[in-house]
Amino acid sequence: MTKTSRPLYISYAGPSLLEMPLLNKGSAFTPQERVEFNLIGLLPQNVETIEEQVTRVYSQYKQCASDLDKHIYLRSIQDNNETLFFRLLDSHLDEMLPIIYTPTVGQACQEFSKIYRTHRGLFISYPERDRIDDILRSATKDRIKIIVVTDSERILGLGDQGIGGMGIPIGKLSLYTACGGISPAYTLPIVLDVGTNNRELLDDPMYMGWRHERVSGKEYEDFIALFIDAVQRRWPDVLLQFEDFAQSNAMPLLEKYRDELCCFNDDIQGTASVAVGTLLAACKAKNETLGQQKVVFVGAGSAGCGIAEHIIAAMRIEGLSESEARKRIFMVDRFGLLTEGMDNLLDFQKRLAQKTADVSGWTAGTEAFPQLLDVVTNAGATVLIGVSGQRGLFTEQVIRELHKHCAKPLVMPLSNPTSKVEATPEEILRWTDGNALVATGSPFAPVEINGRTVHIAQCNNSYIFPGIGLGVVACKASRITDRMLMAASNALAECSPMVTGQGDAVLPPLKEIQQVSRKIALAVAKEAQAEGLALETSEEALLEAIERNFWLPGYRAYRRRSV
């Protein structure tokens, strides 16, 4: 699968070469390479192809007793031979994506200190804040193009996981490579260890992180600033992805730094982009416009509000005014519908609160603010999106009421992991007589209903962020803008089988994700050029750059270079 036959000249040899995951070939080193690099006797005599290696490791993988065991096994391959790891993923992506990322990665984060095997990435702790430059210099990779960083305060729907959150940057970057073709040589996972408020971790004798309550306020902000400044000195052109920061920090950090460097928050912007892409695909399939939809959210955190703002931006592109668009978005939290005058609303929530006058005539219960069923009923909802992290919030009554207003409602229970999902696809389809369009955050098996098989689209950020990263790297964009994200959403929608006429799923199958990433990369890069954020070239040149940067897992020939 390699795209070049040129040999790679390296100076490493013997056991040290076998201990380098980016260069190790294991049993695939050729007889000539074994002599040239002092490997005779360090490997079994038989020389294998990468296909034979994949067969062996897949057989071993199938013997693992649990999903967590499978995750640990795959990570051990990654830490030994990255090329083999990604070739294995390429052969079994549908099967292994839920293992290397959601939902299994959540358990891996919870058990991080117990299952820890070897180092990967950088751990930057608050007590070592004066040595961040030294820590970044210790990274063994010099040409980093994408960093995923977390402070682990909001890991999936599991909350504060301390340094265990490292599993998320590792998993995300694995998807940048498997889905978006970014070479693992150009990626770096980082955890910012600012302590933890998770008492279970603090009391755990095996916990490997800084045993201290979380730093907050000005101390936290100053630490983040030190980190950002150090990253810009070390890798000034890097794409920095913020991952799983708490909502109180996620949006402020994005707003503060998005105009200073090429950065991206996948929880806010990636989730929003894939959700809007899914919504656009559903609208295209039903011959409707986005502006015709009434969208109800359950969960008004940074992710939900980020999706809502992205939908509003898309509605405005269709021609609605901002006020018209905002009237079609309804945010429900644990207290009810976000309404102006509500206490303790964050700034990004206030923008999405409904005006009291607009809902004063609603028929509702006795609570101070309209509840979910009230909102679905009075708003005439056509789309229901769950980002609450609360199992079972989409009740049968709510879904049936939604179906009254819309023959084919779009229902998107996006919470991860599966134990946190607002309703299962089987429940949603049963309660709508098989008429709902369903996209979920976690993977679900197809559903049999009314004599047909319904394939469930996984509204997974892996459809979006690898393509965005590939586009940014290919065109060397200096920033990531809302219009670039909208370009990604539109490109994803155009790939929907419902739009292309190749199936009934809202999103394309994962086996096509590399082609989807290429299309998204082109759309993102063209928009970056249009905004003056990348050097303008022809579309042909962009396509060539995308292919040039798309790494495929295969072994190159090695030649010895003297030190």
Swiss-Prot record:
Top-rank taxon, per record: Bacteria
Active site: 101 (proton donor), 172 (proton acceptor)
InterPro entries: Aminoacid_DH-like_N_sf, Malic_enzyme_CS, Malic_N_dom, Malic_N_dom_sf, Malic_NAD-bd, Malic_OxRdtase, NAD(P)-bd_dom_sf, NAD_malic_enz_proteobac
Database matches in Gene3D superfamilies: Malic enzyme, N-terminal domain (3.40.50.10380), NAD(P)-binding Rossmann-like Domain (3.40.50.720)
EC class of the enzyme, as a word: oxidoreductase
UniProt EC number: 1.1.1.38
Residues the record marks as site: Important for activity: 267
One GO CC annotation: cytosol
Cofactor names: Mg(2+); Mn(2+)
Catalytic activity: (S)-malate + NAD(+) = pyruvate + CO2 + NADH; oxaloacetate + H(+) = pyruvate + CO2
Signal sequence residues: none
Textual note on the cofactor: Divalent metal cations. Prefers magnesium or manganese.
UniProt binding sites for a divalent metal cation: 243-244, 267
Assigned keywords, A-Z: Metal-binding, NAD, Oxidoreductase
Amino acids binding NAD(+): 154, 267, 416
Record SMART domains: malic, Malic_M
One GO biological process term: malate metabolic process
Keyword Amino-acid biosynthesis applies: no
GO molecular function, one term: malate dehydrogenase (decarboxylating) (NAD+) activity
Record-linked PANTHER family: MALIC ENZYME-RELATED, NAD-DEPENDENT MALIC ENZYME, MITOCHONDRIAL
Subunit structure: Homotetramer.
Family: Belongs to the malic enzymes family.
Annotated protein name in UniProt: NAD-dependent malic enzyme
Organism: Pseudomonas savastanoi pv. phaseolicola (strain 1448A / Race 6)
